[in-house]
């Protein structure tokens, strides 16, 4: 996404592409007030956009910060997948804190108000965050694919994950340098350039018209089309491995056919029921691992799907604009403006959506989020949830003992 790029100047306002525009000195101040009142002051629907941006800003910053704190404060959550999730959250915090305010002001005022230096820095950081997000999601998919589909080919470790994260940032910072190099700030009303930054534009300047077509075609393929295609194939194989049919009689097949292992595992952990036999315990461990892998895979698939949907509109619009030259003389300019504005917002909404996904699809993250808010809402603390779970387990203990005896006897017979 390009936070500085706008579809064009406001309708009815003279631009540098038209006739020379001159104002008598006495009328400059009056003209600026006129521009602010009729063109720059937010319209009613733009106030809705501002509220949506503010909501995304707060949710993204708070949510992604809590994700980082949850992994940092809990050693049992420092898994390879969670390291990559933290890296994704850091990229979301970066783009939200630095790029979102600029995008909001550009979308509302259609003016670049931050000067020449930030005209290069902010779009560059935006491109870097996109690259980091795509590469991080790709490494997550690759790690899950190896762990589930080919566990003997590659052993993932936390040290390798940290090295991969450093490599992701190094590659992203390097390959996005051209984005900063081509960004320039200019005014569509040069006569007022020394009086105001209104109607200044931060946009790309290329030496030849062919270069942006090549660059943005490659950008779309490398940061969207190709990685999403590869990740889709990886998760398809993961889905088949975790939910597909298995050879009858194998342990994995038994895991799929046994529908209620959670009560027994929780009861054993709390010491409420008798301890099962060693081989049965191994089976229960595999049940737990299978269920955990399913939950993790489901969460990561949702994260990838939301990312693809949120980045699709701006990716397509940028290709249409930069590669095919559309929207330069758009007849219905308000519709084009609305499309670009909504697509910009969707990119930041993705940053806010990720912590929400973790909350609903990951029990560990949900407990940590509840613990973080427990100072304000004591009923949300993990201790309350644990007490409720303990009472529930005690009420089921007698039933669990009987079902455990029957199931474990059957499992032991089959596995012998």
UniProtKB/Swiss-Prot annotation:
Its membrane topology is listed as: Multi-pass membrane protein
Question: What tissues has this protein been observed in?
Answer: Highly expressed in the brain in the prefrontal cortex, hippocampus, paraventricular thalamus, ventromedial hypothalamus, arcuate nucleus, dorsal raphe nucleus, and locus coeruleus. Not detected in the spleen, lung, liver, skeletal muscle, kidney and testis. Orexin receptor mRNA expression has also been reported in the adrenal gland, enteric nervous system, and pancreas.
Which stretches face the Extracellular side? 1-46, 106-119, 183-213, 322-336
| SUPFAM superfamilies named among the record's database cross-references | Family A G protein-coupled receptor-like (SSF81321)
The GO molecular function terms of this record are: G protein-coupled receptor activity; orexin receptor activity; peptide hormone binding
Q: What induces it?
A: By nutritional state, up-regulated by fasting.
Question: Where does the protein principally reside?
Answer: membrane
Q: Which residues are glycosylated?
A: 194
Q: Which UniProt keywords apply?
A: Cell membrane, Disulfide bond, G-protein coupled receptor, Glycoprotein, Membrane, Receptor, Transducer, Transmembrane, Transmembrane helix
Which segments sit on the Cytoplasmic face? 68-82, 141-160, 236-298, 361-416
Q: Which domain of life is it from?
A: Eukaryota
Q: Which residues cross the membrane?
A: 47-67, 83-105, 120-140, 161-182, 214-235, 299-321, 337-360
Which subcellular locations apply to this protein?
Cell membrane
Residues under site feature: Important for responses to orexin: 36
Any idea what job this protein has? Answer: Moderately selective excitatory receptor for orexin-A and, with a lower affinity, for orexin-B neuropeptide. Triggers an increase in cytoplasmic Ca(2+) levels in response to orexin-A binding.
Q: Which family does it belong to?
A: Belongs to the G-protein coupled receptor 1 family.
Query: What is the name of this protein?
Result: Orexin/Hypocretin receptor type 1
Naturally occurring in which organism (per UniProt): Rattus norvegicus (Rat)
